[in-house]
Amino acid sequence: MTQPEHNALDGSEQTLVDLGTQPLVNNLTKTKEEALSAERYPLKATIDDNLIIKLSTAVPPDKLYKNYLYHSGVNKPYINHCYLLWHKLKHLKHNTIIDIGGNDGTLLKAFQSQTTDKLRLINVDASTSFLEENRIAHIEYVNAYFNKDLALPKADLIISTNVFQHTSDARKFVEGIKEHLDGVWILEFPYSLNTLKTLQFDQFYHEHYYYWLVSPLQKLFKEYGLHIFNAEELSIHGGTMRLWVTNKKPYASTKAHLSFIKQEQEFNFNNCRSNINVKIIKDTCFLNNLEGEIAYFGAAAKGCVYLNALGITTVTQPRAYVVDDTESKQGLYIPGTGMQIMDRDYLYKNQPDNLIILAHNFKDYIIKSLRPAYKGRIITMFPDIEINMYNDY
């Protein structure tokens, strides 16, 4: 393990979140025994005087992503999000569009389907899993980590949704933006102020090196001649910040980002660690006292963190399992827990008394899709415990 690359902006640090040791969330295993004995790493985040939040230690990428099975194309709320984003951007020049960390090409495919304009679409992604899907969609696939040395064409639009927090060297990433941008960069990331206000400790995991606020980003971008001219807080992914960034002058600033910076400067970060610990204890007590059989929905990273933080395993809940719609995950096991990932048919057949939604950022969509086939209690744990009964349907 190593220290994440430090920004020159870094100041003195204090612990913000400490989740002990956790397994690598995306390294699903083939057996229960492998899952229960999965290697663990410290998971602690610090904050400094410049409001930079980052992990205290970093796990090498070759360990983090050796078995990465996420496909954005199975996420219907995200697909809808992509269509909505296109309608916000279509008035801008968009001949060449680069999507950073574009996965299976879901966003660029959505853009492609909404216009007859001839677009040059480029997906820069470090995974080798999506080459064919992008090729079929006529999307140029650059299999690499994004940086300034890729020799890409200048782009009218660069988009990075839910990826900037994955880089351990924020400066190299921004250098790449400066090199390849000739227009607007749309940057979306989990907004850490909302994460901390709502005690979403499951947003902290090893794949996320940084947990961004607007204030330090404004300073960082300014060093590279980049300027924020708009900011929006979105509900997707449990609370997302969208920044509109440019290296050109024609875009008038809404000043919206300044209100977020003010909120960040006024927020009391000192109580976060203790408040999160209390949340973990309360949730553990609630689940331990829950009557009837329990299953879980959503084999996403946040679900793995949540279960491990609460110490929930097949030892404490022998019949528990996790339901997920991603076919490539089904049959595998959640690291640290020993729980197997099953499909919806298994859930509908067994009808456990309780179903805990781990992917709570999509809870409305998930609940609607489960009813009326599933008739038990559906429970979400964030921001507060909420129980949906079958009679409520």
Give the label of every model feature segment:
Residues 159:
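A conserved beta-strand element that flanks and buttresses the S-adenosyl-L-methionine
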